[in-house]
Structures are given as C-alpha cells and as structure tokens.
C-alpha cells in the first residue's frame, strides 16, 4: 500500500496521498485510505484490490484484514478553538504537549466511543483532529460537537 507501520503505540504514520496507519492497540492497526468509502465501479474495484493486496502480504502472519468503512463515520474538528470544543465533550487532554501531531487515542466523547488522531497541520496552517465513531452514534456526536462549537466558530466536517 506504500505505507509504513508506526513504531510506537498510539501514534500514526502517514503519506498524504496514500493515507494513514494508526496503531490503536497492542494487536490492532487501523488503515485510513483516501477516497470515497462508498465508491462504485472502478473506484470500488481499486479499494477491493488494495484490501486483497494487503491480505496477501499478511498471509504468512497471524493477521486478518477487515474492511470497516461502513461501520465507522468520520468527523473533522479544526479551527482556533477546537480544543475548547473538545473539552466540552471529553476529559481527554489534547494539549499539544500531551497529544502532538502524529498521536492517536481511543476514548469516550459525549458518551460515544471514538478513535481520534492528530494529523499534521491543515494546508491553511490550522491544527485539526479527526474522529471516528460507530455510524449509529455519529449523528449524536456530531450534534453535540456542533452545539459545543457554536460559541467559538469552530468548523466541523463529516467525512
């Protein structure tokens, strides 16, 4: 896939065009690939080919590859006051000294299980985080974050 595995737990590696690999637990990695998760036609064939290639590469290991894009929903949180918004829904400290770019974690946010990670700065130089939650909790979490963001003008993005 053109991606390297992280060497430390709770971190990620990235290649802007190829995606992210997150080390989420001692025996689990999550790979976030660019593109439309509900693609059809050639795009879907390309995603299937990448999954097949990874499965073949791991065939000699005690490992499995599971495609979960339908299970998870993504939310991007960015802007000048995104930490203040986050602190309204979770107790996890995301100050840069504790959660620098390249970090990932699993925690609760507004009673929802989330996997979050901090990629590098956006193209406009603003820090951001990306969250994944179960699709069944996504609307609830998005609305809670949207409510918390109103007073700060923080941007939310569903993906």
Predicted region positions:
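Basic, glycine/lysine-rich polyanion-binding surfaces/domains
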Residues: 1-159
């Amino acid at each position: 896939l053109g991606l390297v595995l992280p060497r430390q737990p709770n971190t990620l590696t990235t290649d802007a065009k190829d995606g992210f690999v997150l080390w989420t637990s001692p025996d689990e990695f999550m790979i976030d690939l660019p593109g439309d998760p509900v693609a059809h036609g050639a795009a879907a064939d390309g995603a299937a080919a990448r999954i097949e290639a990874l499965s073949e590469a791991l065939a000699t290991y005690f490992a499995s590859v599971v495609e979960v894009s339908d299970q998870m929903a993504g939310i991007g949180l960015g802007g000048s006051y995104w930490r203040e918004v986050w602190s309204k829904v979770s107790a996890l400290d995301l100050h840069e000294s504790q959660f620098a770019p390249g970090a990932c974690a699993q925690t609760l946010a507004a009673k929802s299980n989330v996997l979050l990670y901090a990629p590098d700065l956006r193209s406009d130089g603003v820090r951001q985080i990306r969250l994944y939650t179960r699709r069944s909790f996504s609307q609830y979490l998005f609305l809670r974050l949207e409510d918390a963001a109103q007073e700060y003008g923080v941007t939310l993005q569903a993906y």
